[in-house]
Swiss-Prot record:
Function: DNA-dependent RNA polymerase catalyzes the transcription of DNA into RNA using the four ribonucleoside triphosphates as substrates.
GO biological process: one example: DNA-templated transcription
Presence of keyword Ion transport: no
Residues bound to Zn(2+) 2: C815, C889, C896, C899
Keywords associated with the record: DNA-directed RNA polymerase, Magnesium, Metal-binding, Nucleotidyltransferase, Transcription, Transferase, Zinc
Higher taxonomy: Bacteria, Pseudomonadati, Bacteroidota, Bacteroidia, Bacteroidales
Comment on bound cofactor: Binds 1 Mg(2+) ion per subunit.
Zinc found in the keyword field: yes
A single Gene Ontology CC term: DNA-directed RNA polymerase complex
Name by which UniProt lists this protein: DNA-directed RNA polymerase subunit beta'
């Protein structure tokens, strides 16, 4: 009767470590050895003894019942049966007891020689090919050359069978009988045994020293990299010494996982469904047993070797079947799922079972609208509620003494007897439920509601909660979850109740904004109508106005005068006479008086502002009531107004025909120009598109005027549009204007869609012709296809964002940093995209901000910038404010509250423990789907805005030019003008009186300038204009043109137009890279003045030998044709930025300020040389196919692109530094979202970018433990440098016994040691100062950054699971469970919000008790003081 020990793992652990398992450990955790491949007896269905399901090893199949049936029942618990050897215990031990298989020969673990980087290969310095040939028994490897060393045979040499036998023949007789430890013995083996011996003999310290030396001193870069790679593996093993030994990468004992985790289920018909693992284990056991027998009967070496190879292969496929070239397949030709596969991917252990579990106490059903619900309520069907709250009802039934046992109570509930409804009402009070709608893209996808029981089978949802859930009632389903514990109920009520979540965490705007019918109703009753009944009446107060309306004396839209309560300048509520309408009075009955009197027409936009104001003035609770009032009023009025529309409400403007006619005439004109040869085909196309775009937008404007003046603007269609209830200008334009230009379907992989130049002239009311309809279908279908594809992308983006930022939590109040970001208005040319007010609101200022004119302190350093302060700053002349930002936060873990600023969901400073990283990821990911879903609304309509090709003065101002280079010309009208020939020219408009810069514009190269530097211009004056359709190259000198390298059909082709017979020279990319087309300008005498390169695709507009004047165009390069706007800008661009990828055609960027000289042409690249004033020279190669943006002698700044294309983030980081690249990424991503009209606060992007910039790469390791080129965390880097700061490195140990050369010691220890040596007159220790490491900041894409986090659990559950675990095991990594994912995987509370680790230690007690403890403490202290 032996007893087994219980080893339960505690669940309150705080760290998880991973490492290689030693054979001893596997044995210790095993409950017995599996000897037979049998699983269960097919007749009795009982497990076979010693087989894969053996009860003796893994435990009984039935609770408390042994195999032979001698012991049954719980009273024999813990007894081991003497007949069958099964311990009598619960059957659930079969989920946790492991077994093992003792292998006859060791095998190599496939993870460590098949996956890259090849660990065993790097340790031994063997290439993968050679390693394979050893492991799979093709070659012998020399482990110890012994006496054969003089014959030139060295360790690690590979021998074929013949060579090996030859050597054996030449060995001295007794050599093979020597001990293995004898250095003279010749040893060579094959297979994993050989590798085991080699690994066991490694001296890691010596190897590390040698590799470090090689990495530091080797001249060849390749060998250096090789050494560094090997060094990394060696260092991992040295760092995890004691936990990991290299030889443990060779498996001698295979663990067998518990049988319940690889079940065998009998199906009907005598067949079995089994886990693939059983097959894989079975093959291992069969081969292992066969090998045992072959060795016993002393089979020939060849047979044994084959069997050993097969054993190695079967263990390989058990561990990782997908790694192998020939995966083991089932009969159906499906590869078997191995142990690694069960961890990988969406269906793997991590993502399927640990991060997302199905839970009980849940239900789901279709949702319907519940307009009479309050903001915090939802309707739950009776039957669903009875099932969800079942245990609660049973408890109450027993408490009330209605039934005695649980079983009978269950029956009553199942029969749905009337008594339970009363109890259910009682139970549901104060017991909220959580509603969730998939996909849960942000935290508002799960909210808590107070349930109400309703008849029917559908869940009722409050209409205002729809926006947050992104729900509609066309058949959406939602899931209900029940929080059980008191803590959960409390959190649901306090934090998650729908009426508390009115603000959107992404941007702080209200998210519960009434939509559709509600908006329409409110808009309708707040609209004024001239000449309505009772116009001009005056009332003494709202009551009288309402009485008059109810009596039918005054119309709801009539403009009347009423004395109402409103706010004066100081914000006090006073009675004022206002011109208003009865409708507005009705609305203001609901609005809280603190907000004042709302005397405007209410649209969706203004409603959002009103709700914001109500929240600020009255708090969340009153806002929820206000929203309910607004909802009821809106529905009621939309119903009373009868706001439907008919065909007559869709008005087609009379002017349409004339406009279209004019369009046709203009197009004819363009075509005749083309036929006469004045313009190229490309220009013709661009101009035609332009004409129709103009016609369309003009028609739209006329249409809007027409429809808005119809019936005083009470046209139903117009009201729906204007109130923001439904529809857009685009849609109305297509209903009653014209559909306009359409995009052409493009071939797969071709560049963006061209636009069909014949527009659709009809609208939907007139109906489309067959051809028009056909053209339309393409857009509509493309829209649907895009949507389906892009939704998946958006989801994946969200997942990567969460993974990179889930461990960013507010961990402290103030990190004490002195750095910040400088914030200004964000401008694009002239228009302000984001005001300073928006950008600094709710942030913390770094310095005191003082009003420059009055000198008053607006905000102290370290204080939050509130609405009032931000407004004051915006109104003052202050241009920029330095604010705290997460990008500059210096917290060790997470970020601090001051650097984050305000929590947008509450409008207060963020609290400790807020999971800001996840919020940021959700805020960016959630609109991602909108980025995608916005395409097809345009129906593929090509919105190509007419090109803007001039600079016009917007105000009276003085002009200042920078970097301006021009040549004088006479333009086509005969006016004198200048042509700009510099690339960096800028013009500043300066206010004549104040000297403030009003705006700055780039003056493009090749534009015609009509003003002089310093000139004062009137408003509306044309400053400059340029050709919108072509980029040009202009001569700066007058002279004769001579072409070089311009050869027909080599570097140019001639396009002639059939219609016009006009011929054009177009430069093409030549196969012969030595021929470079260029144009020289010569003087009369034939001296060279200037040379211009002719770029590929340029149209040459002059002849060879022609005379040109300065300022004349020699080449036109047609700009890319107007492409149809599609999302592809959207999501892929965001991904590209967050992944820090280099754009497809990166620009070549100058790294220094300096002067440009053109070099020679090398291999199809033009060399550009930049020389700085200090004499530094940088050379760049630009492919000839690219247009070069600089000319000879131009002066460029660092960061100026030398060729066309986009600048890469890596270049920005290298040249302009981290701050510049951070701002660049944040602003670029913001641009994509802004374009879609999505508002997201900057701080969310900052958090993601902070996570992308966490790592540095080591340049010089100095005396630290880092390696060159190693990527480490900034924090780790700083800590390591701090650790060796001020310490000394021993150069010569002298006569010291304690210190060795190369050791790092503190100054104090050194002093003690040297004084001791001095006393004994011995040679002292010589030292030098320790050298710190140096590093370079790097930018990582979010995927890389997520895989590089300190937590291996988080990384493994993200992507590349096997690789991550593989690395982690070798490094012996320890996961401190600091992020969210790790804790969810372990089943712990997340370390954020109420689960913040500080709160664990808090003891909650009563105040009196606390006071009593304090009093006692005082007396104790006094007593001590007396002594």
């Amino acid at each position: 009767m032996a007893f087994r020990k219980e080893n339960k793992i505690k669940s309150n652990f705080s760290k998880i470590s991973i490492g290689l398992a030693s054979p001893e450990e596997i044995l210790e955790n095993s409950s017995g050895e599996v000897l037979k491949p049998e699983t269960i007896n097919y007749r009795t269905y009982k497990p076979e003894r010693d087989g894969l399901f053996c009860e003796r090893i893994f435990g009984p199949i039935k609770d408390y019942e042994c195999h032979c049936g001698k012991y049954k029942r719980i009273r024999y618990k813990g007894i081991v049966c003497d007949r069958c050897g099964v311990e009598v215990t619960e059957k659930k031990v079969r989920r946790e007891r492991m077994g093992h298989i003792q292998l006859v020969v060791p095998v190599a673990h496939i993870w460590y020689f098949r996956s890259l980087p090849n660990k065993i290969g790097y340790l031994l310095g063997l290439p993968t090919k050679k390693l394979d040939s050893i492991i799979y028994y093709e070659r012998y490897v020399v482990i110890q050359p012994g006496v054969k060393a003089e014959d030139g045979i060295a360790e690690f040499d590979l021998l074929s069978e013949e060579e090996y036998l030859d050597i054996l023949d030449t060995l001295p007789k007794d050599n093979q009988y020597l001990e293995d430890t004898d250095p003279n013995k010749f040893i060579a083996k094959m297979g994993a045994e050989a590798i085991y011996d080699l690994l066991a003999r490694l001296d890691l310290d010596a190897l590390s020293y040698e590799l470090r030396h090689r990495a530091g001193n080797d001249a060849s870069q390749q060998r250096k990299n090789e050494a560094l790679k090997r060094l990394q593996v060696v260092e991992s093993f040295r760092a995890s010494r004691g936990r990991n030994k290299p030889e443990w990468m060779i498996v001698r004992i295979v663990p067998v996982i518990p049988p319940e985790l690889r079940p065998l289920v009998p199906l009907d018909g005598g067949r079995f469904a089994t886990s693939d693992l059983n097959d894989l284990y079975r093959r291992v056991i069969i081969r292992n047993n066969r090998l045992k027998r072959l060795i016993e009967i002393k089979a020939p070496e060849v047979i044994l070797r084959n069997e050993k190879r097969m054993l190695q292969e079967s263990v390989d496929s058990l561990f990782d079947n997908s790694r192998k070239s020939s995966a083991v397949k089932t009969d159906a030709n499906r590869p078997l799922k191995s142990l690694s596969d069960s961890l990988k991917g969406k269906q793997g252990r991590f993502r399927q079972n640990l991060l997302g579990k199905r839970v009980d106490y849940s239900a789901r059903s279709v949702i319907v609208v519940g307009p009479e619900l309050r903001m915090h309520e939802c309707g739950i069907p009776k039957l669903m509620a009875a099932e969800l709250y079942k245990p609660f009802i049973i408890r109450k039934l027993i408490e009330r003494g209605i039934v005695k046992t649980v079983k009978s109570a269950k029956k009553i509930v199942d029969r749905k007897e009337p008594v339970i409804w009363d109890i259910l009402e009682h139970v549901m009070k104060g017991h909220p439920v959580l509603l969730n709608r998939a996909p849960t893209l942000h935290r508002l996808g799960i909210q808590a509601f107070q349930p109400k029981m309703i008849e029917g089978k559908a869940i009722q949802l409050h209409p205002l909660a729809c926006t947050a859930f992104n729900a509609d009632f066309d058949g959406d389903q939602m899931a209900v979850h029940l929080p059980l514990s008191n803590e959960a109920v409390l959190e649901a009520q306090m934090l998650m109740l729908a009426s508390h979540n009115i603000l959107n965490p992404a941007n702080g705007a209200p998210i519960t904004v009434p939509s559709q019918d509600m908006v329409l109703g409110l808009y309708y009753i707040t609209k004024l109508r001239k000449g309505a009944k009772g116009e001009g009446l005056t009332f003494y107060g709202p009551e009288e106005a309402l009485i008059a309306y109810n009596e039918g004396k005054v119309d709801i839209h009539a403009p009347v005068k009423v004395i109402v309560k409103d706010l004066d300048e100081n914000g006090n509520i006073v009675d004022v006479m206002r011109e208003t309408s009865v409708g507005r009075v009705i609305v203001n009955e609901i609005v809280p008086p603190e907000v004042g009197y709302i005397n405007t027409i209410i649209s969706k936009k203004s409603l959002r502002d009103i709700i914001s104001a109500v929240i600020k003035a009255c708090g969340v609770a009153r806002t929820a009531d206000f929203l309910d009032g607004i909802k009821n009023l809106g529905y009621k009025m939309a119903f009373q107004g009868g706001l439907s529309f008919n065909l007559g409400d869709i008005i087609i403007p009379k002017e349409k025909e004339t406009l279209v006619q004019r369009g046709y005439e203009e197009v004819e004109q363009v075509i005749s120009n083309y036929n006469m040869g004045f313009i190229t085909n490309n220009e013709r196309y661009n101009q035609v598109i332009d004409i129709w775009t103009h016609v369309n937008s003009e028609l739209s404007n006329i249409l809007m005027k027409t429809i808005s003046s119809d019936d005083q603007g009470f046209n139903s269609v117009y009201m729906m549009l204007d109130s923001g209830a439904r529809g857009s200008k685009e849609q109305i334009r297509q209903l009653s204007g014209m559909r306009g230009l359409m995009a052409k379907p493009q071939k797969a992989g071709a560049e963006g869609g061209q636009i069909i130049e014949n527009p659709i002239l009809s609208n939907f009311k007139e109906g489309l012709s067959v051809l028009e309809y056909f053209i339309s279908t393409h857009g509509a279908r493309k829209g649907l296809a895009d949507t389906a594809l892009k939704t998946a992308d958006a989801g994946y983006l969200t997942r990567r964002l969460v993974d990179v930022s889930h461990d960013v939590i507010i961990n402290e109040e103030d990190c004490g940093t002195l750095r910040g970001l400088v914030c200004t208005d964000l401008k694009n040319n002239d228009e302000v995209i984001a005001t300073l007010y928006e950008r600094i609101l709710g942030r913390v200022s770094v310095h005191d901000i003082i009003h420059p004119q009055t000198g008053e302190l607006l905000v102290a350093g370290g204080e939050e910038i509130t609405e009032d302060i931000a407004k004051k700053i915006q109104e003052s002349p202050i241009e920029s404010v330095e604010i705290r930002s997460v990008l500059t936060c210096e917290s060790k873990k997470g970020v601090c509250a001051k650097c984050y600023g305000r929590n947008l969901a509450t409008n207060h400073m963020v609290q400790k423990g807020e999971a800001v990283g996840v919020i940021a990821a959700q805020s960016i990911g959630e609109p991602g789907t909108q980025l995608t879903l916005r395409t097809f609304h345009a129906g593929g309509t090509a919105a190509n805005i007419a090109a803007n090709a001039s600079i016009v003065a917007k105000n009276n101002a003085r002009l200042e030019f920078e970097e301006l280079r021009t040549v004088d010309i006479v333009d086509e009208t005969g006016e004198a003008a200048k042509v700009v020939v510099g690339r960096l020219a800028e013009v500043r408009f300066i206010d004549v009186n104040t000297g403030i810069v009003l705006s700055t514009h780039n003056v493009p190269y090749g534009s015609t300038l009509y003003v002089a530097d310093g000139e004062v211009v009137e408003k509306g004056k044309l400053i400059a204009k340029w050709d919108p359709f072509n980029a040009v190259i202009i001569t700066e000198a007058t002279g004769k043109i001579e072409f070089e390298g311009v050869i027909e059909n080599v570097t140019y082709k001639i396009e002639s137009d059939e219609a016009t017979g006009l011929r054009e020279i177009i430069i093409i990319e030549s196969k012969d890279k030595t021929k470079v087309p260029s144009a020289h300008i010569l003087t009369e005498d034939g001296d060279l003045i200037r040379t211009y390169n002719l770029p590929v695709g340029g149209h040459v507009v002059i002849e060879n030998g022609q005379k040109v004047k300065a300022g004349e165009v020699i080449v036109k390069i047609p700009r890319a044709v107007g492409k149809a706007g599609d999302i592809t800008g959207g999501l892929p661009r965001v991904t590209e930025l967050f992944e820090a990828r280099n754009p497809s055609n990166p620009a070549v960027v100058s790294e220094i300020d300096g002067e440009v000289t053109m070099g020679k042409v090398k291999r199809g690249n033009r060399e550009i040389i930049v020389t700085s004033k200090t004499g530094e020279v940088k050379k760049y190669l630009v492919p000839l196919s690219k247009q070069i943006l600089v000319q000879e002698n131009d002066y460029v700044r660092a960061g100026t692109p030398l060729s066309d294309g986009a600048t890469t983030p890596a270049d920005i980081l290298a040249i302009k530094g981290p701050t510049a690249v951070q701002e660049y990424i944040v602003n670029e991503v913001q641009d994509v979202y802004r374009l879609q009209g999505v508002k997201i606060n900057d701080k969310h992007f900052e958090i993601i970018v902070r996570q992308m910039m966490r790592k540095v790469t080591i340049d010089e390791p100095g005396d630290t433990r880092f390696l060159e080129q190693q990527v480490v965390d900034k924090l780790e880097f700083m800590e390591e440098n701090d650790r060796i700061w001020g310490k000394k490195v021993v150069v010569d140990a002298g006569d010291s016994e304690n210190l060795k050369a190369g050791q790092i010691v503190t100054a104090r220890k050194l002093r003690d040691e040297n004084s001791m040596l001095k006393r004994r007159d011995l040679k002292p220790v010589e030292v030098r100062d320790a050298v710190a490491a140096t590093s370079t900041q790097i930018l990582q894409g979010i995927t890389r950054a997520a895989l590089q986090t300190s937590s291996f659990m988080s990384a493994a559950s993200f992507q590349e699971t096997t690789k991550v675990l593989n690395e982690a095991a070798i490094n012996g990594k320890i996961d401190k469970l600091e992020g969210m994912k790790e804790n969810v995987i372990c089943g712990h509370l997340i370390p954020a919000g109420t689960g913040l680790r500080e709160f664990d230690k808090i003891i909650v007690g009563s105040k009196e008790e606390y006071d009593r403890i304090l009093a006692n403490k005082k007396t104790v202290l006094d007593y001590n003081e007396v002594e």
